[in-house]
């Protein structure tokens, strides 16, 4: 069988075309061959979310440093070139000070959005906001976990047409069936955190290794 060796740039174009054909319009990885949403150097592809009283945000040593704000602080993706379903979103975060959530993840669920809140409502509530008009402290996804300061945690969200699943490290925290459920963001400033956002509430946090990976249906 005869093989054809294409120049590197032609191979890259061919691979990108195949990937787009497989995933469909609007459902491509952030960069060809890489699931990374954060380059470790600057906020390229992101913007500081315009939260009133938000803390200072800067990139140092391969991490996003979020200073404590009056209420909520964070960043959101500055483009819409992301999957809406059949994907995994993950990030690692550490809380240095404060007593509330330090890596809220806002993400698309089909045509709407939701937020995974680890350590909200005083530091221990874990869950999804919002489901059928109820936030993470009120709906059936609410669980309770103590988050230690000065320790890195890995948070992961998986979205398919039928489910939203979330993990804290390797422990599943949410396993939500979507059929006949009304999914939406909690009304308020978190609505600025789309299409993908990372937030901290009155905490000092650092974020690294933000990744978005399409998964097979």
Briefly describe each language-model feature range:
Residues 2-15:
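Bacterial N-terminal signal peptides that target proteins for export
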Residues 15-25:
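Bacterial N-terminal signal peptides
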Residues 27-217:
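Carbohydrate-interacting regions of secretory-pathway proteins
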Residues 4-6, 20, 145:
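A subset of signal/propeptide-processing and intrinsically disordered low-complexity segments
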